[in-house]
Amino acid sequence: MTVQRILIVAGTHGNEINPIWAVKQFNRNENSLKHGIEYEYIIGNPIAYEKGCRYIDADLNRSFKKSKNYDQNENSFYEISRANFLVDQFGINGSKPCQIAIDLHTTTANMGTSIVMYGRRFKDFCLAALLQNKFGLPIYLHEKDKSQTGFLVEAWPCGLVIEIGAVAQNFYDPKIINRFLIIISSLRDEIDKLKKNLIELPKDLVVHVHQGSVDYPRDEKGDIDGLIHPKRINRDWKMIKKGDPLFLNSQGIIYKYDGDQFIWPVFIGEVAYKEKQIAMSYTNKEVICSKNEWVQEFHRL
């Protein structure tokens, strides 16, 4: 294995301030090189962080797009320019190349500490399996959603999001900060153990696979006309079956789940997703058998 540099990104969203505090604290107290692996730290969206807002022109974590109809160089949005800078600096062909990107986020939803993956790259599965085995973290595998693309970690050969909540935007929570510190502190140790064949991946990886999202109930003007049902609040990762309540509108009407399949909701009531018309996303649970190819590809980084 030749993994040498890991990019740790905090503040991809400027009002998610706990990861920034955690990274600054870790950088003061820890050596930059351990097990032959060096961390590179960066605030993803420094201007938004200074202003205390999620972004300036566009969501930075949707700005790493590659398509024939999307020209990164001609877009005037600040976040597009920032995405180009991050890739030029820290991308695999950048001036300070990193093989792995870890993007640290907080959420107002009651997600606990979780891992977010985008797609089914073997290297990502390997890294996610290491962390799930160490900490027992749930994994949200985000795929099949063409309206949500351009995620930061997809611009690197390997990458994951660490998502922790619930915590309000622009509010420091020492418990949240400590969780980030534990994961950052342990990441290189787990990679080193794998490199030295001191640990193996678990036989199975449990993931919650994205199936879609649902908006709040709305009136004829398009305004929100319903709230998350009291029985659904703070129930991320908890199974929903047919007939379970989802929303309660202003007339007292209960909106129930009418699907035949069990689903597991995530990001329930996430404040930042209102603009995306998402009240919650829903997933199916999938058990994936670990593969030797995961480790083999990770070794090639």
Curated annotation (Swiss-Prot):
Belongs to the AspA/AstE family. Aspartoacylase subfamily. Substrate binds at residues 54, 61-62, 163, 273. Its cofactor is Zn(2+). Keywords: Hydrolase, Metal-binding, Zinc. InterPro entries: AspA/AstE_fam (IPR050178), Aspartoacylase (IPR016708), AstE_AspA_cat (IPR055438), Aste_AspA_hybrid_dom (IPR007036). Transmembrane segments: none annotated. This is Probable aspartoacylase. Binds 1 zinc ion per subunit. Pfam families: AstE_AspA_cat, AstE_AspA_hybrid. Zn(2+) binds at residues 13, 16, 105. It catalyses: an N-acyl-L-aspartate + H2O = a carboxylate + L-aspartate. One of its GO terms (molecular function) is hydrolase activity, acting on ester bonds. Gene3D superfamilies: 2.20.25.160, Zn peptidases. GO terms for cellular component: cytosol. It is an enzyme of class 3 (hydrolase). It comes from Prochlorococcus marinus (strain MIT 9312). Its EC number is 3.5.1.15.
